Amino acid sequence: SDRIVRWDGERLQIAARSTAENVDPAYLADFRTISWTAPDGSQVFGLYAPPSNPRWQSPGLPPAFVQFHGGPTSASWARFSAEASYFTSRGYAWLEVNYRGSSGYGRAYRNALRERWGEIDVEDALGAAQALAQQGLADPTRLVIRGGSAGGYTVLNTLVRHPGVFKAGV
């Protein structure tokens, strides 16, 4: 629903609208595909959105969120993302990692995670951090890794097995 309502025990009243009708597109996350090479030589793919606030720019490279989808064999696609837009409009970069095992890149890519979940996805988390730095897209000292469900498992494994690569995990 697009309304914030108030209930006084007898009547329901619209207190406010929760969505703006005229959001300036300059503040929305604008995804583009990036890729990097995994240790086994295969390409790994992600969707990168740079900071999107025309009235503010980070001094130097921006901090970044590195997002892992659930599944583990789901995938992230370019789309409107309120969550990504919230952070990119506040000066953060945003990367959604389609780690090896994600759908949409062919059978071999999808099967790469088979019997190696907790290894391949973690390699790709480290590769994502390295790619953001090497491609000049984010400050490698200000990276946050995040994910839910299977992505949360990747976050935990990465933080425990490779402390210091990411400054925080969600």
What does each model-identified segment do?
Residues 1, 163-164:
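Proline-centered flexible-loop/turn and helix-kink motifs
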Residues 152:
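Residues forming the Rossmann-fold NAD(P)(H) cofactor-binding site
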